[in-house]
Amino acid sequence: MVKAVCVLRGDSKITGIVNFEQESDSSPTTISWEISNHDADAKRGFHITPFGDNTNGCTSAGPHFNPHGKTHGNVTDENRHVGDMGNIETDCDGNSKGSIKDKLIKLIGPHSVIGRTVVIHAGTDDLGKGGNDESLKTGNAGPRPACGVIGVAN
């Protein structure tokens, strides 16, 4: 079992923890999160980027993690970036808690997400269905108010 954790912070009041667990190289990865202080009653884009570089805030982390050269999509789509995790949904206080299992996001192997960045966006991810070029790259999810590097956990 490999475990990883990401602590989310940024230029805003948003904070959170994202946990990752993978049993073996062939198992799906479980991703669970608890995020606080985002916009109330909203859907907000949730992605993994290729770099663990946050020297210039969340923008220096790069585009969505896409080692297979696919277009942007939802976490449940066959054709999507490895780093596409869809949207988190916040409650009336701006908090979100949830989990998903994913077969593309890996902690083990050449495309491991350890050392990469989780980004929470300021807008809703259109899941690649926005009808323009930017939708196929970013889902038009907007600015990046919070992010954190994924590190190995005990």
UniProtKB/Swiss-Prot annotation:
Disulfide bonding pattern of the chain: C58-C147
Residues bound to Zn(2+): H64, H72, H81, D84
Residues the entry annotates as binding substrate: R144
UniProt-listed InterPro entries: SOD-like_Cu/Zn_dom_sf, SOD_Cu/Zn_/chaperone, SOD_Cu/Zn_BS, SOD_Cu_Zn_dom
Main location: cytoplasm
GO cellular component: cytoplasm
Stretch forming the signal peptide: none
Role description: Destroys radicals which are normally produced within the cells and which are toxic to biological systems.
Protein name: Superoxide dismutase [Cu-Zn]
Gene that this polypeptide is encoded by: SOD1
